[in-house]
């Protein structure tokens, strides 16, 4: 029985082992699918961030180069070209790759042959323009350092160079219409699901990557090395000695300012980020084209989709952060916009109703009147005697107002008696007329019984009653602003100078006849 039991046990345990192996395989496959799905979601999120940041950053670069004159016109043209190509690549490449990364079979119309070829052509063009803009900027930097007092690249030559960049990109991208399964740096989706390898496709991939990617990047590093060598101390010494030996020839001494050094660092950082982010793309091209491996890893494919697009975001970020002059201009412009916006908020426009809770500067619509009012209060502070006299006068006027109110009949409507102006406004000719009758108890300050306030009212120190006050600030030239303005300052007699025969200056005072 034990033998039978031992014999049955392996027979019964074998199906259990096979079912366990199948369950383990299913669980591992499910784990891989879940990891791939999580990585796909991460890829989609990163591409959305790159899309928004690239558009905002490149538009900011365009705005800063158009608004400020930090760099020369030739350098600005190349930077604008790089920013425009980044915007176009972000608009054309990123959205469709986001859709394909989310769900590869969601949009069937993307896989139509005509639409796919046109889309891949635009991908190639904008990617090529972005890469070819790097050596153009490096060439401009090389000439500006080696010949700081000369202009080797004129505006016409820079326009021709930009036209060549776009023509090169278009010519290098035209074969996409003949080859369907072509992947580029910023978009790795293909027009056919089955990868077909051919000799023509291999030749095109090699020629394109050598002429449009590898050679331009090598030229950038070559120019940067030449710039570094020209700025070295030994090379400068040789140039100075040669200039001293041949003074009749004009020899330029290499020079790089702080601004140009920052631009060199920006260019080097851009190219370095581009190379590092393009490593997954290069690996994918080698796998599919050279090694002819059709079934590549999903993780490699997704990494080759999102990682090269980081350079679209890194280019404007590096340009706006590394260059101190650009950063200062950008911050200054933002501060000016903030001041202008806050000033517009302070000055209320469009509504005629004024809230009583607002400050006087907001009620008036301008801060000048409030500043004038504060200045008057600080300069013309009443003395103790003046405060006592004003208090007595206010008490007498309150008593008179009460008598008028008690003497009026009860059946009639009570009308507000015209307030007697204080002594401070008796001689004023330019007093502001009241808009509405004001009760004396609303304004408890020294101007309580004045019906209006304006910048042309006379302070108490200008009036005849307070002429002998110690706090007078003006001489007694008149009582009103008109009299003060009409007073004439005595003319100072001019002194005549005459030259004698001995070249001596004689000064004769002019006598009024």
Swiss-Prot record:
Annotated keywords: Biological rhythms, Cell membrane, G-protein coupled receptor, Glycoprotein, Membrane, Receptor, Transducer, Transmembrane, Transmembrane helix
Spans through the membrane: 42-64, 78-98, 109-129, 158-177, 205-225, 265-285, 302-322
Pfam families (alphabetical): 7tm_1
GO cellular component: a single term: plasma membrane
Gene Ontology BP annotations: adenylate cyclase-inhibiting G protein-coupled receptor signaling pathway; circadian behavior; G protein-coupled receptor signaling pathway
Region named Disordered: 1-25, 404-432
Protein localization: Cell membrane
Membrane topology, Extracellular segments: 1-41, 99-108, 178-204, 286-301
Domain of life where this protein originates: Eukaryota
Tissues in which the UniProt entry reports expression: Expressed in brain, lung, heart, stomach, intestine, cultured aortic smooth muscle cells and cardiac myocytes.
GO molecular-function terms, A-Z: G protein-coupled receptor activity
Glycosylated sites: 4, 11, 17, 26
InterPro entries: GPCR_176_Rhodpsn_7TM, GPCR_Rhodpsn, GPCR_Rhodpsn_7TM
Bilayer topology: Multi-pass membrane protein
Chief site of localization: membrane
Gene3D superfamilies membership: Rhodopsin 7-helix transmembrane proteins
Cytoplasmic side stretches: 65-77, 130-157, 226-264, 323-513
PANTHER family reported in the protein's UniProt record: G PROTEIN-COUPLED RECEPTOR, G-PROTEIN COUPLED RECEPTOR 176
Family: Belongs to the G-protein coupled receptor 1 family.
Annotated function: Orphan receptor involved in normal circadian rhythm behavior. Acts through the G-protein subclass G(z)-alpha and has an agonist-independent basal activity to repress cAMP production.
Protein name, as recorded: Probable G-protein coupled receptor 176
Organism encoding this protein: Rattus norvegicus
